[in-house]
């Protein structure tokens, strides 16, 4: 739906985790059961209420980019606001009135995109009225010319135009069909391609190592003697880095695809390589390394969730995107199991059993993050292979679609 409506610029998400944390701190502090009940009911209720508004709209208006930039500015403002609030809450103990005030301001920011939508609707209405007024004036002028006695009945050769031949019409139709039907694969057809498995392997390495990092953030912080406040800040800020990765990767890849013709898998190569560096930074165990490493890993992890769905729709088509996309997302739990359980959990338990119940020091997670750094580098190489395999496809098909 998003790909069809916003064909020239894909959407983003990922900031909801930080918003829900603020909702818990304000409304359900110390009541986890109430919070879990809200999480169970609220998404379903919102979907039922708003599902009638979900449909395919033609968003190719003259002001589309301006309105999308407005949404982006609001989203970045929310991310910056949440980052400041999370840091303040983990440094100071905010009173109830302050938490309520910050949450109300957050709600105002969340609903502010409605203002952009209403403004866009008014602009479209005014544009339609102006167009109708111009057409009415033209019809009036034409009627006056017809009823006027001073008109010429001489044949004007300029009025005769040659109609396009049947061959040219057929040719244009066949070109359009080629662009529409190109690479519209179903799940079984996609799974028979090398591109599918390259993308799947890259996602196992990228998403799996990212989930392993956030799932073990508390234990990593404890082993490196970080305070509880610092650990809470790291966990809370993960949603911010996740969102910035999703937003940034989508925006940057869209920009370079439209302006430079760069195939989108190239940015998957870059982000997975940076994620490998982030894992090496965490493995070093240097003072402050967990802060820097978590930022790199969090941003690059979020990037995969922005790049993968878009690449899937572009390479395999949108007709069966739902099944293909959800099949590729299996890479996330598979990678999480491999890295969280079989790598990080196994090595930590082994080190903890030798030292007692808990493990302290860089040796607890150094080997695990070295392994994950190697895995993300492997994922980057898989994405590099996908880039070279699809480079000509992007130049010949995707860019032609965007220019239609």
Where do the PLM segments sit?
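Intracellular juxtamembrane helix-capping segments at the cytosolic ends
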Residues: 1-8, 17-21, 50, 213-217, ...
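Glycine-rich segments within core transmembrane alpha-helices of 12-TM secondary carriers
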Residues: 2-52, 62-86, 241-245, 322-344, ...
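Extracytoplasmic gate region of multi-pass secondary transporters
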Residues: 5, 82-98, 177-251, 305, ...
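Interfacial helix-cap and linker-helix signal at transmembrane-aqueous boundaries
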Residues: 23-29, 86-92, 221-222, 252-257, ...
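Symmetry-related core transmembrane helices of the 12-TM Major Facilitator Superfamily/SLC fold
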Residues: 35-52, 69-81, 98-115, 361-386
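Long, low-complexity inter-transmembrane loops of multi-pass membrane transporters
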Residues: 54-192, 198, 393-404
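Structural signature of the two symmetry-related core transmembrane helices
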Residues: 263-280
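Helix-loop junctions at membrane interfaces in 12-TM secondary transporters
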Residues: 282-293
